[in-house]
């Protein structure tokens, strides 16, 4: 969000937008337009040939996945050159309705999603409601601070019937599409007990791959213990930034604090990856940070094994990975974590990057 942007452009005869860097030029001159067109040509050249599996220049495999929210999203994403979905936001089945979806209704949607991706991985996040996504039928009362209240898994613990139905529906979908690679994860897990509670119920429902989202400093710091209870973890960088920096991610004025380049946030990601290494469990990222080609290199250097993002960002991230070997990514990660500020972190990484990468940003 940019303060005053609406007033600044209302009388402008022309506005130029560079979506690659998030830059708006009000009343651009001929030179501005020519520069944008040249930048667009260089970006197209940098993306040329970006296809196939995600991997660094020296062959370290990194799965590149899509974030989706509906069966229609799945059908569109599945036609693209990516390796599955690292985040299916199941809450869209529950929002804006007076009663919970039935097991049959959910199973039908999950089946369509799995069928769309065939044998490719699909990671479903169980109901992530509460806070900015309230459920009218949950009957949990008003909360003074919903972001720190009963959201994510906490809501599922308060309304276990909702989770039971969802896990049953997911198991049904998995049975309907036996070749599918279904992974299921719980949001907003903060403790080992919560991870164990969810894993026991998911496995009892017949689900084979069970994980958690790391969105709180508590889960990141104790990731090695949390991961002893589950099969994988996925880092939600949006909420992890919010809770690490104590900054509401819905307030645009705090965007600088919520930057994925904040060294404190990167330290949390490093701790989570160390937990993954200690337990032999894979760590992924499904927040917006994974779709930034430059940040993606740092995440890989920290030990992240998969990146899930908006489908349209996959090609740029894949191209960025292929420009760098893993040792360079690791060096970038060390520089970023050790930086004093978010700006210093980004500048240090950019200085190590292949010059062609700038055309992808």
Where are these regions (language model features)?
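Conformationally flexible catalytic loops at phosphate/diphosphate-handling active centers
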Residues: 1-14
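Conserved acidic functional residues
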Residues: 13, 18, 239
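Acidic/Gly/His-enriched mid-domain segments of enzyme catalytic cores or analogous surface patches
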Residues: 16-50
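Conserved alpha/beta-domain cores
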Residues: 42-361
